[in-house]
UniProtKB/Swiss-Prot annotation:
One of its GO terms (biological process) is protein K33-linked ubiquitination. Its main location: cytoplasm. Substrate-specific adapter of a BCR (BTB-CUL3-RBX1) E3 ubiquitin-protein ligase complex involved in interferon response and anterograde Golgi to endosome transport. The BCR(KLHL20) E3 ubiquitin ligase complex mediates the ubiquitination of target proteins, leading to their degradation by the proteasome. It also specifically mediates 'Lys-33'-linked ubiquitination. This is Kelch-like protein 20. It is found in: Cytoplasm, Perinuclear region; Nucleus. CDD domains: BACK_KLHL20, BTB_POZ_KLHL20_KLEIP.
Length: 604
């Protein structure tokens, strides 16, 4: 070994080393070469260590505890169980008798569920499914395995349906899963018209029925539906529930009924007529309806109109370029609340991303992450507010790519791969999780906009790598061929494109010299483009989408500033008007519109 100091004859290395340790033991004196260092962290070590420990468990080697669950004996290591479960840590490190026992009996837990959880402790893997979730969640709660509790709740969220939401709600309540309980409550309220017809609804105890019908957000067309649901519930087990009718009826908002229904249906029902408290509630409602001048003095929970959260289309703005870098953030605009809210971000930053909606799922294709061109694809599920990356990648990297859906396939059109501008077109089959090449365009196009109309896929404008284009091509999937159609009046790259009132609108973008505010539209019946009134702002890299019948231009770049503002086109007044703004400024982001069929947007 090299000495740390030059020594005189007779000096020993030990003496010298002792001098070296004076002061900082890790620092050699000045002038002495510092030893080379290479910190090393193994990614394999944790996994390989667990694998070996799991093999020891399976061979019953070095095991120091046996868990007895019913008729099952499970061999394990206390240190592993204690590291994974606060329940076992308290058991084995405290003064409990179990800390000294080699066999420990675990009660009130399913054998198979315990096996799965012990396996998870050794492997980090578990499969939650319909057949085990009802035993797995209670077991995870007992062992205080929060990660598995969350996984079970996430699984149950995805299974929510009008036929089972009440059962899931009760299950969540029993096991104190507050988030799952909240989501099940919201789902029940939003889908009450279907829920009230389910067997689970008829089996509800009175207190849970009252909880549901007391909500201001109960989604019903009229209070008649609530009354009918209550009476159906009572008559399902009339002898047992008849005494509970007055208590439940207090939470039906009888003053909101029409006079005809109140008198003709409610007041004449034998169950109502035979109970004094019920008759009093009907009389209260009659007075409210017949004496409008007295209504200010009669306000209360039963006179408060319900305010259900209505469902509709929701606009998503995905990725883009902001503050000098590509971004992964995603936000959504709900016209019902007139609010932009952040949702789950993508796993990658993506500018020049292609976005479209297939089977109520939002796809983000390719783009550029600030340093690399991407061929990866992500898929967003609005029901769970989660992105997944298990979608097959495109055959080549693509940014400034056009993406649209036609005939159940997701098409990726043109773009650039970092080397050249592309005319390549491929389509994704979600059933096969596979991309397949189709006929290429006649022209290379980056910054191209795409739209689907009349069974055809249109590729509008873009740049051939040298200059912006005004040319347009149309793809016929039956022939697998592209055909050239009438060109636009203006050359545009990085434009926005959407189908509105059976015509293709092309807005903004950039020509040879500047960002554009102009707009035009294509009539397929005449094969002609005609000008449309210009937007209030120049917008290159703009997103264009139709949301609940409104044409909206989203974000972009005006030549000076990245934009977060929105404009809406009014075809009657032939004007664009500003319509608020996003949370983030976005250039080259994608937009997509999803119909929220069960009001998922208000669940998470």
């Amino acid at each position: 070994m090299r000495r740390c100091l030059n020594t005189r004859p007779g000096e020993t290395g030990m003496d010298v080393t002792s001098r070296c340790t004076l002061g900082d033991p890790n620092k050699l004196p000045e002038g002495v070469p510092q030893p080379a260092r290479m910190p090393y962290v193994s990614d394999k070590h944790p996994r390989q260590t667990l694998e070996v420990i799991n093999l020891l468990r399976k061979h019953r080697e070095l095991c120091d505890v046996v868990l007895v669950v019913g008729a099952k004996k499970i061999y394990a290591h206390r240190v592993i169980l204690s590291a994974c479960s606060p329940y076992f840590r308290a058991m084995f490190t405290g003064e409990l008798a179990e800390s000294r026992q080699t066999e420990v009996v675990i009660r009130d837990i399913d054998e198979r569920a315990m096996e799965l959880l012990i396996d998870f402790s050794y492997t980090s893997q578990i499969t939650v499914e319909e057949g085990n979730v009802q035993t797995l969640l209670p077991a995870a709660c007992l062992l205080q395995l929060a990660e598995i509790q969350e996984a079970c709740c996430e699984f149950l969220k995805r299974q929510l349906d009008p036929s089972n939401c009440l059962g899931i709600r009760a299950f969540a309540d029993t096991h104190s899963c507050r988030e799952l309980l909240r989501i099940a409550d919201k789902f029940t309220q939003h889908n009450f018209q279907e829920v009230m017809e389910s067997e689970e609804f008829m089996l509800l105890p009175a207190n849970q029925l009252i909880d549901i019908i007391s909500s201001d957000e109960l989604n019903v067309r009229s209070e008649e539906q609530v009354f009918n649901a209550v009476m159906a519930w009572v008559k399902y087990s009339i002898q047992e529930r008849r005494p509970q009718l007055p208590q439940v009826l207090q939470h039906v908002r009888l003053p909101l009924l029409s006079p005809k229904f109140l008198v003709g249906t409610v007041g004449s029902d034998p169950l109502i007529k035979s109970d004094e408290e019920c008759r009093d509630l009907v009389d209260e409602a009659k007075n409210y309806l017949l004496l409008p001048q007295e209504r200010p003095l009669m306000q209360g929970p039963r006179t408060r109109p319900r305010k259900p959260i209505r469902c509709g289309e929701v606009l998503f703005a995905v990725g883009g370029w902001c503050s000098g870098d590509a971004i992964s953030s995603v936000e959504r605009y709900d016209p019902q609340t007139n609010e932009w809210r952040m949702v789950a971000s993508m796993s990658k930053r993506r500018c020049g991303v292609g976005v479209s909606v297939l089977d109520d799922l939002l796809y983000a294709v390719g783009g550029h992450d600030g340093s690399s061109y991407l061929n990866s694809v992500e898929r967003y599920d609005p029901k769970t507010n989660q992105w997944s990356s298990d979608v097959a990648p495109t055959s080549t990297c693509r940014t400034s790519v056009g993406v649209a859906v036609l005939g159940g396939y997701l098409y990726a059109v043109g773009g650039q791969d970092g080397v050249s501008c592309l005319n390549i077109v491929e389509r994704y089959d979600p059933k096969e999780n596979k991309w397949t090449r189709v006929a290429s365009m006649s022209t290379r196009r980056l910054g191209v906009a795409v739209a689907v109309l009349g069974g055809f896929l249109y590729a509008v404008g873009g740049s051939d790598g040298t200059s912006p284009l005004n040319t347009v091509e149309r793809y016929n999937p039956q022939e697998n061929r592209w055909h050239t159609i009438a060109p636009m009046g203006t050359r545009r790259k990085h434009l926005g494109c959407a189908v509105y009132q059976d015509m293709i609108y092309a807005v903004g973008g950039r020509d040879d010299t500047t960002e554009l505010s102009s707009a035009e539209r294509y009539n397929p019946r005449t094969n002609q483009w005609s000008p449309v009134v210009a937007m209030t702002s120049r917008r290159s890299g703009v997103g264009l989408a139709v949301v609940n019948g409104q044409l909206m231009a989203v974000g972009g770049f005006d030549g000076t500033t990245y934009l977060k503002t929105i404009e809406v086109f009014d075809p009657d007044a032939n004007t664009w008007r500003l319509y608020g703004g996003m949370n983030y400024r976005r250039l080259g982001g994608g937009v997509g519109v999803i119909k929220m069929t069960h009001c998922e947007s208000h669940i998470w």
